[in-house]
Curated annotation (Swiss-Prot):
GO terms for molecular function: iron ion binding; N(6)-L-threonylcarbamoyladenine synthase activity. It catalyses: L-threonylcarbamoyladenylate + adenosine(37) in tRNA = N(6)-L-threonylcarbamoyladenosine(37) in tRNA + AMP + H(+). It holds the Pfam family TsaD. This is tRNA N6-adenosine threonylcarbamoyltransferase. Keywords: Acyltransferase, Cytoplasm, Iron, Metal-binding, Transferase, tRNA processing. The keyword tRNA processing applies. Belongs to the KAE1 / TsaD family. GO terms for cellular component: cytoplasm. It comes from Rickettsia akari (strain Hartford). Its main location: cytoplasm.
Length: 386
């Protein structure tokens, strides 16, 4: 039986998985680093890389035990080799290549985005081609998935990724990290029409997106509600920049102090009802933007493919776990005769099962990678063969 070992370390989750040729997930271990990064309000690349270094052995041991698999039974090792935080990518890739060399088994370098792109084929056996909305903390793009390694980017964000925007707005509201799930929960209790936020380039006529202006609008609203002037805010930003330059050993103390300051500002001026309304209005605006862009993406997709027997839109990445957006985008897709498909929640966020599956497809096509492959911090889906 073919068994593919997958390794994922592109951001702050250390993940290892084993799947079979029949798309059965024998084990899928994820070691989260959320508590290590929470005090900073975001992912610190150096901490992430060091944690991957200490977590990979543990994750591999647990996966082998849970799947009742011996290392010699592994057919190939697939590992995220970009894009992502380069320190973590290198740690995972080197770990995988060491196993490959020792076991004399093929190594397969996987583009992290391809892992997300193919997840629906792992879970639902979706045929090619299909339209993909990849929405995560680091990326937001519409992609025509025409076949293995054949991707056409129809449009992408020109500034912030949608998941990053969720996290930053959550941070403004003093919500826990990661911010996406926190925003979603608060939004359930708020009025989505309480505040009107801008929808940048929503009428551009193409598939590109922008979230920076929306993020700024939320920040401005919060400052106005808190009656904090721009000078004080700019001073706080300059303090933040100075703090970043301090020694790593002092960072925890500095960020704790900064977070306490932010906490006092939010808790003093914004009650729970206001926070809920901001979260709901923000999430509603995101839904409006993505729904409009899905329509643009469908038109662009239909210009480059003539396969209309299976009209599927896949949403993948961490943002795909948002139930509100699932419902909004599903209704939008139905209007155009498409079915919206999204992976189970545990496969929306970063995981190694998707990496192992991408490895399986490449293994079946004998697309192996030399051990001298250089990991990449940036690696477009359209350049996946380079």
């Amino acid at each position: 039986m073919i068994k593919i070992l997958g390794i994922e370390s592109s951001c702050d989750d250390t993940a290892v998985s084993i799947i079979t040729e029949n798309r059965e997930i024998l084990s899928n271990i994820i070691i989260s680093q959320n508590t290590e990064h929470a005090v900073f309000g975001g992912v610190v690349p150096e901490i992430a890389a060091r944690s991957h270094l200490s977590n990979l052995d543990k994750a591999l041991t647990n996966v082998l035990k849970e799947s009742n698999t011996k290392l010699i039974e592994i057919s190939a090792i697939a590992a995220t080799s970009g894009p992502g935080l380069i320190g973590g990518v290198i740690v995972g890739s080197m770990f995988a290549r060491s196993l490959s060399s020792t076991l004399k088994k093929p190594f397969i370098a996987i583009n992290h985005l391809e892992g997300h792109a193919l997840t629906a084929r792992l879970t639902d056996n979706i045929p090619y081609p299909y339209l993909l909305l990849l929405a995560s903390g680091g990326h937001c793009q519409f992609v025509a998935v025409l076949g293995l390694g054949k991707y056409k980017i129809l449009g992408s964000t020109i500034d912030d990724a949608v998941g990053e925007t969720f996290d930053k707005v959550a941070k403004m509201l003093n919500l826990a990290f990661p911010g996406g799930p926190e925003i979603e929960q608060k939004a359930k209790l708020g009025d989505p029409h309480k505040y009107k936020f801008p929808k940048p380039i929503i009428n551009s006529g193409n598939c590109n997106m922008s979230f920076s202006g929306l993020k700024t609008a939320v920040r401005t609203l919060i400052m106005n509600l808190q009656e904090i002037n721009y000078n004080e805010c700019n001073h706080l930003e300059s303090v933040r920049q100075d703090e970043v330059q301090e020694e790593f050993a002092q960072r925890t103390k500095v960020h704790e102090h900064r977070r306490k300051l932010q906490n006092s500002l939010v808790s003093s001026f914004l009650n729970d009802s206001v926070i809920n309304d901001i979260a709901a209005s923000f999430q509603f605006t995101i839904g409006e933007i993505l729904s409009s862009k899905v329509q643009d993406a469908i038109r662009a997709y239909e210009q480059i493919t003539n396969n209309f027997d299976k009209k599927n839109i896949i949403i993948a990445g961490g943002v795909a776990a948002n139930k509100y957006l699932q419902e909004i985008l599903s209704n939008c897709a139905k209007t155009y005769g498409y079915q919206l498909i999204y992976p189970p929640i545990h496969l929306c966020t970063d995981n190694a099962a998707m990496i192992a599956y991408a490895g399986l497809e490449r293994y079946n096509n004998k697309l192996f990678t030399p051990l001298n492959f250089c990991p990449k911090a940036r690696w477009s889906l359209e350049d996946i063969s380079k």
